[in-house]
Amino acid sequence: MADIDARLREDVHLLGELLGNTIREQRGAEFLDKIERIRKGAKAGRRGSAEGAEQLSSSVDGLGDDELLPVARAFNQFLNLANIAEQYQLMHRRDDKQPLPFESRVLPELLDRLKAEGHSPDALARQLSKLEIDLVLTAHPTEVARRTLIQKYDAIAAQLAALDHRDLNSIERTQITSRLQRLIAEAWHTEEIRRIRPTPVDEAKWGFAVIEHSLWHAIPNYLRKADHALHAATGLHLPLEAAPIRFASWMGGDRDGNPNVTAAVTREVLLLARWMAADLYLRDVDNLAAELSMQQASDALRASVGDSAEPYRAELKRLRERLRATRNWANASLSETLPAPEAVLRDNRELLDPLLLCFQSLHECGMGVIADGPLLDCLRRAVTFGLFLVRLDVRQDSSRHCAAMTEITDYLGLGRYEEWDEQTRIDFLLRELNNRRPLLPSYFKPAADTAEVLATCREVAAAPAASLGSYVISMAGSASDVLAVQLLLKESGLQRPMRVVPLFETLADLDNAGPVIETLLGLPGYRSRLHGPQEVMIGYSDSAKDAGTTAAAWAQYRAQERLVEICREQQVELLLFHGRGGTVGRGGGPAHAAILSQPPGSVAGRFRTTEQGEMIRFKFGLPDIAEQNLNLYLAAVLEATLLPPPPPQPAWRTMMDQMADDGVSAYRAVVRENPEFVEYFRQATPEQELGRLPLGSRPAKRREGGVESLRAIPWIFAWTQTRLMLPAWLGWEAALSKALERGEGEVLAQMREQWPFFRTRIDMLEMVLAKADADIARLYDERLVSAELQHLGAHLRDLLSQACNVVLGLTGQTQLLAHSPETLEFISLRNTYLDPLHLLQAELLSRSRNREASLDSPLELALLVSVAGIAAGLRNTG
């Protein structure tokens, strides 16, 4: 631990020094001295020095308008560099004496444990190879870093790795340090903030870039190591076509609350994915054609290429021509609709078969060592990513489908669909689903919103099945929500089954999820329209915003239990799709622990989850880090499948029922029932300003109104910026305190010790409370909140203190995260750079609100940079 601390601090010190050189060169030594004075004041203030805190405060207050932006930029860059150093620490080269990191050990150790539990080698190999883990990449307004800078940060991490070699001479060390200096200067002189909002297509390209630069390399590497672990434990290998983890995307498909995602955008993103996939395979195949110059070939390969002197090259050149044709067609189709020429690859077998033919031939001819190199990597990519790179999900709000159905029934003279009761809707929808004639005449001219819904359904019908994932219905609450989408898709020409997935988001809808699915599975003809298992999406963000995380977490758990039970009774396979965010307030947290805390039977070899915004970059932005996280997913889903936790004891259920009631009452008493709350929220946080920032393609609000109209992400993002972290803990302080007052501390201790669900919740709560900071939140109140609302802020800080104390009582520690000194070290390291940014942001908000500033004024730009810096410093922001 001390070794990691020392090395981390050494790297941070070096990067900070090089950034200081860059700043001095541009703005002079006097300006750098100001930055240092602010930093040292923050550091001393954190150690309890009143003098240091005063030095920090007076230094920030004394900044002129022209200094606000460069100071904000300096601390933003410090935090990004600290993040790079921390990420590098997670994957740095270790010598033989150091134990492997948990992420590298987790699968081999699990396989040994499963073997000891009595699972046969065959069963283990079979289960591992047929796992279906779907990671769904989504764009979110909290990913504030520009792609240009991300690439520079990756290059900085590579130079830190180069510095880690112990056999460097002084010349080599100087060269690497010079490269680092140059990269840091490039980052400093690159504007870190987008001036214009990204389009949905920009967001999709960002997602493709993560695949190109990281996941493309991580996938074959993690599979190679998984295969090695399996072979070491069982003597068996992973089948060549095993792809336990695949990727889907919402970028370009998620139109819920985002009018910028149109049918045309979805079509463009599907074509771009196809273009990108062909381009990436072309690079692989070019390299393979250069390497595979051998003459010896199997009879099967000879039958394919004839008596060519270079049979492998001949086979690969044919594949290369087809990949070029596919790439050219996809590119040309972006500007006009073109029929696909014969040479275009349509089915993944057309990509896989030539590669397999070469692979098998090499093995047959005694050249297995060659086959198991880059050719095997390419094969595994082809199985994982296919011709379409990612499967695109489509998501739309149930109210949009209801409005479209209402316009249709109105036009047909059948009455208003939105006014019908549920049974009338179901009867009508089933009748039309089973009717062979079209519902609408070809000359039907709908209003713009309905036309867009139908155009999206036509794109879904026209797209290849393998390019699409699920059609997700947000704010679903009834069986008719699912049937309506099935009918709209049928009406648009879809002639194959497709996964139409209800997303249950509010507390009431989660409680009703079981009955809705039970109704659907009992309807005539419904199962024939299912594509694979019954998929159901559990919403974490809106349920937590609606009721607080105590009640939401328990409602999510109970809903999953009921769905498992219903699908087991109905003999239908179930796939649960977890709509998690990056923060605890939106269901985020360490994936490994979260998966192992799911109800027994809910992870039966299948797991689907969203990976969001900035978390994609932190978890999958670098190949080595991506590989570690893929290992964690693989091991957790395998363990949850073969070693599910026992069901909770009746006393624990009773306790959670009571705590959920106490939690939701306490949460809503503040958020819903206090008439001053919304005004306080708007004054104390940068919520209003966040709506103006060009952070993502989606508007921050669904409609005008109070907290309920806000999307879950800006709601969380705003509280994170001020360090109150309110949505992640509010309600827990009351729920846990009341349980202790009732004398149930022993039951709580038992739950934490024996029940993974409860232990994980408390661990995540502890993590977020360790990042919360009442002093920082008070600072925002003092600068920004009117005198008559100050008492509300003080009350919320008291509740935060209560939450911290009750968690410490439960864990038996004197300090939050005392059991994880490494995490505490990372938080402490960042606070030195975060404190000035918080102080600066409060000052900027105050100045901004007291004058009219244009969006590109230094004041607004500095505010943007402060938002980005705090987001970088706290990592999981929304």
UniProtKB/Swiss-Prot annotation:
GO terms for molecular function: magnesium ion binding; phosphoenolpyruvate carboxylase activity. Forms oxaloacetate, a four-carbon dicarboxylic acid source for the tricarboxylic acid cycle. This is Phosphoenolpyruvate carboxylase. Its EC number is 4.1.1.31. PROSITE patterns: PEPCASE_1 (PS00781), PEPCASE_2 (PS00393). Belongs to the PEPCase type 1 family. InterPro entries: PEP_COase (IPR021135), PEP_COase_bac/pln-type (IPR022805), PEP_COase_Lys_AS (IPR018129), PEPCASE_His_AS (IPR033129), Pyrv/PenolPyrv_kinase-like_dom (IPR015813). PANTHER family: PHOSPHOENOLPYRUVATE CARBOXYLASE. Keywords: Carbon dioxide fixation, Lyase, Magnesium. The keyword Magnesium applies. The keyword Lyase applies. The gene is ppc. GO terms for cellular component: cytosol.
